[in-house]
């Protein structure tokens, strides 16, 4: 049997969507799902991803 992996599925959510007063293309919060290796990356992920609601690249942080 295969071992249980150290990879877990995490959700990334935009940090600028709630605080931004810029004009939006549509309402909503941008979220992405990805995998991370808990053994190598113990802290929370923080990546620059495209936010289709704000129509620009923003910082997305890992949420629980």
From Swiss-Prot:
> In which domain of life is the source organism classified?
Bacteria
Q: Looking at the keywords, is DNA-binding present?
A: no
> Which BP terms in the Gene Ontology apply to this protein?
translation
Q: SUPFAM superfamilies from the entry?
A: Zn-binding ribosomal proteins
Which InterPro entries does the entry mention? Answer: Ribosomal_bL33 (IPR001705), Ribosomal_bL33_sf (IPR038584), Ribosomal_zn-bd (IPR011332)
Gene3D superfamilies for the chain: Ribosomal protein L33
Which key words tag this protein in UniProt? Ribonucleoprotein, Ribosomal protein
Q: Which GO terms describe its cellular component?
A: cytoplasm; ribonucleoprotein complex; ribosome
Q: Which HAMAP family match?
A: Ribosomal_bL33 (MF_00294)
Family in the record: Belongs to the bacterial ribosomal protein bL33 family.
Please give the name of this protein.
Answer: Large ribosomal subunit protein bL33
Q: Which organism is it from?
A: Prochlorococcus marinus (strain MIT 9515)
């Amino acid at each position: 049997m295969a071992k249980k992996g150290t990879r877990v599925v995490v959700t990334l959510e935009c940090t600028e969507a709630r605080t931004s007063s810029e004009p939006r293309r549509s309402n909503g919060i941008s979220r992405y799902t990805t995998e991370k290796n808990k053994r190598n990356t113990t802290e929370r992920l923080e990546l620059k991803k495209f936010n289709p609601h704000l129509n620009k690249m923003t910082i997305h942080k890992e949420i629980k």
